[in-house]
Every structure is written in structure tokens, then in C-alpha cells.
Amino acid sequence: AFNGILFMTSKNPFNSGGVSVYGKTGITSSKDAGDNNFVDAGIRMAHKFSEKFAAKASFSFLKGTEWYATDYRDYNHAAEKAGEATIINAETGQTSFERLNIYGDEVKLSETPFGNLQGVAGYLASIGQIPAALVPLFPTDNVSRTGYKERDLTDYEANSAKVDVALHYKPFEDDLEIIYNAKFGQGNTIYQGANRYSIKNFFMQQHKIEVRNDDFFVRAYMTDEDAGDSYDMRFAGINLNKANASEWFGTYAGAYATGLGQVLGGGGNPTDPAVQSQLHANARQYADATVTLKPGTSKF
């Protein structure tokens, strides 16, 4: 139980018959998601057919829009040895980051055999892709992939449909009762756990057989669930960027080398932090435009 256990006792169709309905509607409003409709409706039907048999069925439907996760500040891991990482604003010109609600920027050069950008440059020079004379001019910066915003990996639409059917039988028309109960649920939402999960086409069913009277009860349950098309959004972003990481880092370093040549040709200083920051920005832009899979495209 993630948030505790809730005990519920439903109405018995022998005692509570008829039809009841409910409906709720409203609007959820937020800066990022705007105004969105919310609907929650349901119906319950129950009937006592005889002193021995009664049945009930209920159906409910909910539809709304999840809150958007748009805090893109950066994790600061400097204090990890003392405890949890803190959250800071990303710095201008930063080349390696791990931002909140952006997935895939965990893929970094520091986790590859190259180690840093100069390591990639050395490899490209060894296979004749860039001039060897440029390698010492590459900074030893760690570079991370450009991640995907959470809103690019999910649609934030939430809905659920639930069905509950119960058959009640009293063989001796006394307090001994045999109950068969079936529950079915399907839905889409976002689940927050260790990571953020996009729950898509989730389906769950539970079946119960119960024998009871005023002095005892015996229950047997069967529960089955299918995650459908659900996925961990953090690892979805990571795996998308891992799939073509070598190509992206190579393209990045190649674009940086092109920029270095232009700076040297114009008499500039390639070790100037402002120049390096611009070279990094141009290299990232080119690598993203050339290699990174774009949300909304067929390849993505």
C-alpha cells in the first residue's frame, strides 16, 4: 500500500435496490495546461429478484487533464556525499546538466569511453575526421545529450472507466449468503513513484467469491492486471538518447571543430570562455537538428 489501506463496504442489493446516478463536472486551470474540462459520472443499478437472488451493477467514468510538470531546474550533485542532491537554476553556457522533468540528459560523455569532449576529438582525429592540430584546442568539458521535456513523452490526458458486477444468492433464505463479485477497470494517467510513469491502456480485473453469514465469512480472490502500453518516461528519454549517442557526440564534436576553424581563421581566441560557450551552443544546435529524434515525427 503506497498511501495506506482503505476499507470499503458496498451496499447489499437485497437491502438497497433501485437506480442511482451521479455526475460532476468542472474546469481545472493552470498556467501551463490552461483551462481543461473535468467530468466524473456514474450509475448504480440493483434489484432483488426473489428472497434467494439479487444482483447489482455499477459503472463510472472519469476524464480530465493531469497537471503539467514544467519545472526545468537542474540537479546539483555537489553535495551528494552529504545527502540528497539539491535543485538549482541551470547556468548559462552549461554543457552538462540533469534537469527536472527532462529525460535523456542523463546520457553524458563522462559515462562513455571518451570521457569528455577532447576525448571525442582525439578519436575523430585518429580516423581522419578532423585535423589533429585542433584536438588540444578542445576543452575537456563534459557534455550531456539534450533531453526530452516530459510533455514531449506523454499527452497528460487522464481517464478511467470502471465496472462492478455482483451476484448475491441466499440458498436457504436466511443469513447464509453466497456472493460473486467482478470488478474491471481501465485507464490512462501519470503515476509518480521512483520515476514518472505514463500509464497507458492499463487494465485490471478482480474476481471474488464469498460465503458468509452473521458468524463467519470465507473469501477467495483473483486479481489480474495488464500494464498495456505503460512506460517509465525517464528511461524512455534515456533509451531514446542512448540509441544514437555515439552519432550525436561525434556530430557535436565535428561541429565544434568547424567552429574552431572559423574562430582561428578570423583571428579569434578559441580558449576565451565566451567563445567556447558560443561554440558549444552552435555544436548542440547542429547535433540536435541532425541526429536527435524529433517529437511528433514518425521516427520518434
Model regions and ranges:
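N-terminal periplasmic accessory domains that precede
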Residues: F2-T25, V39-M45
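Outer-envelope beta-barrel architecture signal
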Residues: N15-V19, E51-A55, D174-I178, Q205-H207, ...
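Flexible loop and strand-edge segments within Gram-negative outer membrane beta-barrel domains
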Residues: G64-Y68, E177-R212, F216-V263, N269, ...
